[in-house]
Amino acid sequence: MAAAGARPVELGFAESAPAWRLRSEQFPSKVGGRPAWLGAAGLPGPQALACELCGRPLSFLLQVYAPLPGRPDAFHRCIFLFCCREQPCCAGLRVFRNQLPRKNDFYSYEPPSENPPPETGESVCLQLKSGAHLCRVCGCLGPKTCSRCHKAYYCSKEHQTLDWRLGHKQACAQPDHLDHIIPDHNFLFPEFEIVIETEDEIMPEVVEKEDYSEIIGSMGEALEEELDSMAKHESREDKIFQKFKTQIALEPEQILRYGRGIAPIWISGENIPQEKDIPDCPCGAKRILEFQVMPQLLNYLKADRLGKSIDWGILAVFTCAESCSLGTGYTEEFVWKQDVTDTP
């Protein structure tokens, strides 16, 4: 893994945004909803997006738009992270990278307009420019179709059954029933834009103990209680946890820390990966940290409405150091999950 350098760290914050800002043609970084796919061809299929623990479809968690300056083949580049929110595992994680040159088959050569489009509706995209159909429930590749109407597409039998139960059974036989009005399947996470800001450097001598207490006090009672609860599980790892608290103190609402090749900040001294734990890319290159997802994101997900809640301390996403060329396909990368407490 690469050592920390002088590169600035970019922080991500969850903010509400109009639906049009979160569509693929705007190249968004976002949490929840359906994926705003970058390349419209070569999407990961149902098997690639199935939980390795329980086998059920993963939920889209977030995507980060991260183009690489000086790389014509990665003028557009995005990382997509998926997780399992089903009981009993609530743990499965998979991450994919996709990149495109500026001149491609899917987007204009010129930057997108910053003005809202003329239409006012918030229709759901169910077919990409490549012709690929998307699942009505999750927005991932939908190779399966309703055997009755042949108009509704799904990624899996599970999602077809869910949609059937929540209204497709009644609507299926009606003409023109698939007008992009999709019921709430209670599967997607709440949707937010990820707004990026550069982290201000915090000099150690500036954060005195009395100031530190004031900073932590400004973090909000709920978050302070959450972190104090985490602290109860710490023993010899106190220094690591205190470093974590100090690092996030000035921006306690950060949900993401981005910086290719930087060192992650861990929440615990346990389950920190060694270099041998991070598999090389199939191209032969090492993988380096691209970004880490912070526990603060859990406050936005409302995941406990399904029963047992998903949980993590840190999700560290590692990608190919060379960002190897992919054409229009999606390549799986690696994510390391550090828990606050041991998972039963």
Swiss-Prot record:
A molecular function GO annotation: DNA binding
Keyword Metal-binding: yes
MYND-type zinc-finger residues: 135-172
CC annotations in GO: cytoplasm; extracellular exosome; nucleus
Major location (coarse): nucleus
Tissue: Ubiquitous.
Signal peptide: none
Pfam families linked to this entry: PDCD2_C, zf-MYND
Protein's cellular compartments: Nucleus
Post-translation changes: Ubiquitinated by PRKN, promoting proteasomal degradation.
Chain residues that bind Zn(2+) 2: C146, C149, H168, C172
Annotated positions binding Zn(2+) 1: C135, C138, C155, H159
The keyword Nucleus is annotated on this UniProt entry: yes
Keywords: Apoptosis, DNA-binding, Metal-binding, Nucleus, Ubl conjugation, Zinc, Zinc-finger
GO biological process terms held by the UniProt record: apoptotic process; positive regulation of apoptotic process; positive regulation of hematopoietic stem cell proliferation; regulation of hematopoietic progenitor cell differentiation
InterPro entries assigned: PDCD2_C, Znf_MYND
Function: May be a DNA-binding protein with a regulatory function. May play an important role in cell death and/or in regulation of cell proliferation.
Protein name, entry field: Programmed cell death protein 2
Species whose genome carries this gene: Homo sapiens
Species lineage: Eukaryota, Metazoa, Chordata, Craniata, Vertebrata
Gene responsible for this protein: PDCD2
